[in-house]
């Protein structure tokens, strides 16, 4: 099956170009960005729990093992495997516990992933955050990379804040300044996020991070 990518096009890009000269320059330098999405809500939640506090490469290694072992990643296959087998795939006990707890809620009808589709962004973040192991940042990433919501802009994402510092030459991004950019990019914050992530990852080599270096400890 071919990969699915976050959907955006000239409508979103034209809006962002008109709203912000610097972001316009970034968009023109980088071009179109293909970011894969996972439209399966259950598997997306599991994938994001696996990825917490580890590298993307490590996340994909564990995820691939899980798919090879379980076949379809579903509430039934997760619960049939159990915590010890999930741990054997390379995840921590805590993550295995979170994933099986989530699977149990889905199986028992206490959590309906498909109901998220009809919720507002705030409602969906709140519902996802009620799950063990899911915080606001993880919930926002699920909204962006699974539900493909167009207006997600996560203050808790360190790379987004780094990208803002690099593009706009800020030393620090506090909540008030962050919200100013959210208002500027809305209703297409998700597309803006893709470009800020790219900048933070080094897509434009001459751009640097203006965050002050921490003073060295005295010996």
Show where each model-derived region lies.
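Flexible, active-site-adjacent loop/turn segments at secondary-structure boundaries
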Residues: 31-33, 40-43, 52, 89, ...
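A general alpha-helix detector
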Residues: 44-49, 81-85, 123-127, 141, ...
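A positional/architectural concept
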Residues: 11-71
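Alpha-helical ds-nucleic-acid-binding substructure associated with the helix-hairpin-helix region
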Residues: 22-26, 54-55, 59-132, 184-186
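C-terminal accessory module of base-excision DNA glycosylases/AP lyases that mediates lesion recognition
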Residues: 1-33, 97, 136-219
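Short, amphipathic alpha-helical segments that act as regulatory/interfacial helices
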Residues: 46, 63, 100-103, 196, ...
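Alpha-helix N-cap and coil->helix boundary residues
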Residues: 37, 57, 61, 73, ...
